[in-house]
């Protein structure tokens, strides 16, 4: 919320209330709001202020302020833009990160807001005419950058051309792209995006496009026409060696504190610690290529403006004012780059009340007459892994890889490593998943052998398998529905593990059915139940879970105070699955008997606070390269599918899991090599978000992206299936050529709602005992023989079951192979109030328009008889744009998780 005072500019009234961009131009010594239609058009004679708002689901909003200074902007406007940036920060509660942007040296984060590029316009901004004295003329543009393109107008002369860059010649009837012979494929592809932008915005899509290859002239009419603009062809001279900048070693960061008069005082130490930063002072951290100004919470607005002016003056005296990035940080909002210069910067973890909030919303819907099972969890994957069809599990024991029988597939041991392969069909597209499951007590040699054997299996599927490296206890939620019911026992069957146990004399720690055992029961439904054996001590208990304590022919069930009703249902079913024939003794937390405590070795303290799951706020995409065993990464801001260039390797950091995407034309040729990159990324923890080496790492190849990867993009399958390099694909797309694909494209997962995704699966049969398994190809003779032997075990019947949408009561009986549907009482409200489908025609909803205040979840006068999961659809087009900052068509083109974030921020979900 804005926090305005009489000293804050009225232009900031109501800012920061919705996600997106807001832009102002300094005009006649005051701020003028720029209309959305002019976003991305910056004039070199002006200074601008740009606010980017991101309303997060759990934490407070994220604000980034950029003040952009044109190369011809006067000093008065530049200083005013800097001061107004601080005023805007104050209006937003002093919780922003501010960046100074100089024309031609903009940060990649700033450029990412205006894809594919910004092309500064000469002259000054005029609110009446837009551009003072603008006339169309032939221009020559130089493009630099392989992932973020920087466009600069250069003199329309042959001498402006060189062999290293890509140039665009924009004429009245044709746009030429000239590619220097030393330019990369990615640079040419990015420049082609600029060509498309120019064609659409300056020529209304009505002009020809031609590409000119440096050094190729004969027989090319387009090349002849291009050179005619320069008075005829002539060789381009090579750049002299003197123009090549030598790489200098980056000096250590130097910290200064800034007094109230603006004087800089060096701290005189190269070893920096957070305790050196005092709340009532401002500091400047000079990192040579970038400078940070840190402002304590107890400093005044005047002190902050003085410190910024002093830092800018420092850069001017150093001759670095146009080449050095300046970032302004308020105490408590330090970014990862700034923190990396300090020793052991303490991590602060914000507590999350997400689950409690969802429970309150569910209760509210229930009061309104809706069945809460109709409300999908936006973070869950569609239930494409709701049965054990085509599941195979191998146990790794040194050089031996043993295929497990069907009954043993659901029994894993903490001292072993396993390969879990699952093949399923989604929208007529076959998907392959191969997990490397690492037991928490497994031997390092077995872990290495597991990865090697997994790579062999992946090789036999021609790279189609998605490889995932997971540790016990850190499995992704989509791992468990493959098993439906899974038990993890302590101990192991590996020869190496048994030798280690014998050496350490820990034989008694293995599972023994004749001795007492404690199992933690986990799962949200009968589709993903787990019983995990834990240490037989009271400290293993946790109030958030339920437990089964087996001892001989008897059993206790312990129900934590913070466990849910679904936990209790899963507990009852796991008792049956564990084959506990006796009548269990139910104990609620706080009512334990002496016998119970004695079996656990006595009463002791255990965790009693609610465990919260980690939410994906905003994924981060990085391009990566590895040279001399050193991993180098660079973040791609505001990423889209087109950023995944086929020549590169990318890392998608989702905090709770990491994806390594391999372009088909990259120099990474094996998934084992890609997995190594992912593990190195975990070790680096670039964003200092608490990544551990146990974080799941997926390896995905281009053209075989699974739905749980593409959900983070506005995904178009046809783009991923095109042939050629990045430049050839862009050119073919621009010229409208029909391109061949690598394989038949799958359905667009992103555009499908979870309702429809699940509904599509209802027509599929659920195998009651894991039958209908496919043959798993393996590269070694041993693995091939295992696949052949498996065919002899697959002779069972399957019972088709029509599963209700979002129902949690499907139970597969492992003994008789019959799927049973537990009856549950449902409200008749659904019959009285038919729900509108997620893909129904928007016009039918718009005909029932309601005001925003009526549609809010917390409305005092709520509207009834609507689809509660699509409240935004009942807004008029005008009010929708006012609230969301975009048209409905743009909104529904966003990934589902982004839609839900916006709806939650506006109290519409």
UniProtKB/Swiss-Prot annotation:
Residue numbers bearing the Phosphoserine modification: 780
Superkingdom of origin: Eukaryota
Gelsolin-like repeats: from-to residues: 29-79, 149-189, 262-305, 391-448, 529-569, 631-672
Tissue: Expressed in all tissues examined. Mainly detected in the vascular tissue and the pericycle of roots and in the vasculature of leaves. Not expressed in the root cap.
Cell location: Cytoplasm, Cytoskeleton
Domain HP: residue ranges: 844-909
Keywords: Actin capping, Actin-binding, Calcium, Cytoplasm, Cytoskeleton, Phosphoprotein, Repeat
Region (Disordered): 733-781, 816-835
Pfam entry (one): VHP
Chain intervals with Basic and acidic residues compositional bias: 752-762
GO terms under biological process: actin filament capping; actin filament organization
InterPro entries: ADF-H/Gelsolin-like_dom_sf, Gelsolin-like_dom, Villin/Gelsolin, Villin_headpiece, Villin_headpiece_dom_sf
A GO term for molecular function: actin filament binding
Example of a GO cellular component annotation carried by this entry: cytoplasm
Function: Binds actin and actin filament bundles in a Ca(2+)/calmodulin-insensitive manner, but is unable to sever, cap, and nucleate actin filament formation in vitro. Does not protect individual filaments from severing by VLN3 (AC O81645).
Family: Belongs to the villin/gelsolin family.
Designated name of the protein: Villin-1
Native source organism of the sequence: Arabidopsis thaliana
Classification of source organism: Eukaryota, Viridiplantae, Streptophyta, Embryophyta, Tracheophyta
């Amino acid at each position: 919320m804005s926090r305005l005072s009489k000293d804050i500019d009225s232009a900031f009234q109501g800012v920061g209330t919705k996600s997106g961009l807001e832009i102002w131009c300094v005009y006649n010594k005051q701020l003028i709001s720029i209309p959305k239609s002019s976003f991305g058009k910056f004039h070199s004679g002006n200074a601008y202020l740009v606010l980017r708002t991101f309303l997060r689901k759990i934490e407070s909003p994220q604000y980034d302020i950029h003040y952009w200074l044109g190369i011809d902007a006067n000093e008065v406007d530049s200083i005013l833009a800097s001061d107004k940036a601080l005023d805007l920060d104050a209006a937003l509660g002093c919780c922003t990160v501010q960046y100074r942007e100089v024309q031609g040296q903009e940060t990649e984060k700033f450029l990412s807001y205006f894809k594919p590029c910004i092309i500064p316009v000469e002259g000054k901004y005029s609110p009446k005419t837009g551009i003072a004295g603008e006339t169309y003329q032939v221009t020559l543009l130089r493009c630099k950058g392989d992932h973020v393109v920087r466009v600069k107008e250069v003199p329309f002369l042959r001498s402006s051309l060189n062999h290293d860059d890509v140039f665009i010649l924009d004429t009245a009837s044709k746009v030429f792209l000239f590619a220097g012979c030393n330019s990369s494929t990615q640079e040419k592809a990015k420049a082609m995006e600029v060509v498309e932008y120019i064609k659409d915005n300056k020529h209304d899509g009505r002009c020809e496009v031609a590409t000119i290859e440096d050094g190729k002239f004969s027989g090319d009419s387009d090349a002849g026409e291009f050179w005619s603009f320069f008075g005829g062809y002539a060789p381009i001279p090579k750049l002299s060696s003197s123009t090549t900048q030598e790489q200098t070693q980056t000096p250590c960061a130097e910290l200064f504190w800034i007094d109230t008069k603006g004087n800089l005082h060096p701290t005189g130490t190269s070893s920096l610690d957070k305790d050196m930063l005092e709340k009532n002072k401002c500091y400047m951290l000079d990192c040579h290529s970038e400078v940070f100004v840190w402002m304590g919470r107890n400093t005044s607005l005047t002190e902050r403006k003085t410190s910024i002016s002093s830092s800018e003056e420092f850069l001017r005296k150093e001759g670095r004012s146009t080449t050095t990035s300046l970032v302004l940080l308020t105490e408590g909002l330090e970014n990862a780059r700034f923190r990396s210069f300090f020793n052991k910067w303490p991590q602060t973890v914000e507590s999350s009340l997400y689950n409690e909030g969802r429970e309150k919303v569910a209760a509210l819907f229930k009061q309104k007459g809706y069945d809460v099972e109709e409300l999908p969890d936006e973070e869950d994957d569609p239930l494409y892994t709701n049965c054990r069809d085509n599941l195979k599990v191998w146990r790794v024991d040194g050089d031996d890889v043993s295929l497990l029988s069907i009954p043993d597939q659901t029994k894993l041991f903490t001292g072993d490593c396993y390969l879990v392969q699952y093949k399923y069909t989604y929208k007529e597209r076959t998907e392959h998943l191969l997990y490397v499951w690492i037991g928490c007590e497994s031997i390092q040699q077995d872990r290495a052998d597991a990865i090697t054997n997994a790579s062999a299996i992946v090789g036999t599927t021609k790279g189609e398998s998605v490889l995932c490296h997971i540790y016990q206890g850190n499995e992704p939620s989509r791992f468990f529905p493959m098993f439906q019911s899974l038990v993890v026992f302590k101990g192991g069957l590996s020869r190496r593990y048994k030798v280690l146990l014998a050496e350490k004399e820990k034989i008694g720690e293995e599972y023994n059915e004749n001795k007492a055992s404690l199992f933690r029961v986990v799962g949200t439904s009968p589709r993903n139940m787990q019983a995990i054996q834990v240490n037989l001590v009271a400290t293993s208990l946790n109030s958030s879970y339920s437990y089964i304590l087996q001892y001989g022919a008897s059993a206790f069930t312990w129900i934590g105070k913070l466990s849910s009703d679904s936990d209790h249902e899963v507990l009852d079913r796991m008792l049956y699955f564990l084959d506990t024939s006796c009548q269990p003794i139910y104990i609620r937390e706080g009512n334990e008997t002496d016998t119970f405590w004695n079996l656990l070795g006595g009463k002791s303290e255990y965790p009693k606070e609610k465990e919260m799951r980690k939410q994906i706020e905003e994924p981060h995409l990085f391009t990566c390269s590895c040279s001399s065993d050193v991993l180098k990464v660079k973040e791609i801001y505001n990423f889209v599918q087109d950023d995944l260039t086929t020549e590169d390797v990318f890392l998608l950091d989702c905090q709770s899991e990491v994806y390594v995407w391999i372009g088909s034309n990259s120099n990474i040729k094996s998934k084992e090599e890609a997995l190594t990159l992912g593990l190195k990324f975990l070790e680096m923890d670039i964003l200092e978000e608490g990544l551990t080496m146990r974080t799941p790492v997926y390896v995905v190849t281009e053209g075989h992206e699974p739905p749980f990867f593409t959900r983070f993009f506005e995904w178009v399958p046809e783009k991923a299936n095109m042939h050629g390099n990045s430049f050839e694909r862009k050119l073919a797309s621009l010229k409208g050529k029909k391109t061949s694909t690598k394989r038949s494209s799958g359905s667009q997962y992103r555009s499908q709602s979870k309702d429809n995704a699940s509904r599509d699966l209802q027509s599929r049969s659920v195998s009651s005992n894991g039958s209908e398994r496919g043959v798993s190809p393996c590269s070694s003779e041993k693995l091939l023989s295992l696949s052949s032997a498996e065919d002899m075990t697959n002779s069972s019947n399957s019972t088709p079951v029509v599963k209700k949408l979002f129902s949690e009561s499907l139970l597969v009986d492992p003994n008789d192979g019959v799927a049973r549907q537990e009856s549950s009482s449902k409200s008749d409200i659904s019959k009285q109030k038919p729900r509108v489908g997620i893909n129904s025609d928007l016009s039918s909803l718009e005909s029932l328009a309601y005001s925003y205040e009526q549609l809010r979840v917390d409305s005092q006068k709520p509207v009834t008889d609507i689809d509660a999961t699509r409240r935004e659809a009942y807004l008029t087009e005008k009010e929708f744009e006012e609230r969301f900052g975009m048209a409905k068509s743009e909104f529904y083109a966003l990934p589902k998780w982004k839609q839900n974030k916006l709806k939650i921020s506006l109290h519409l979900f």
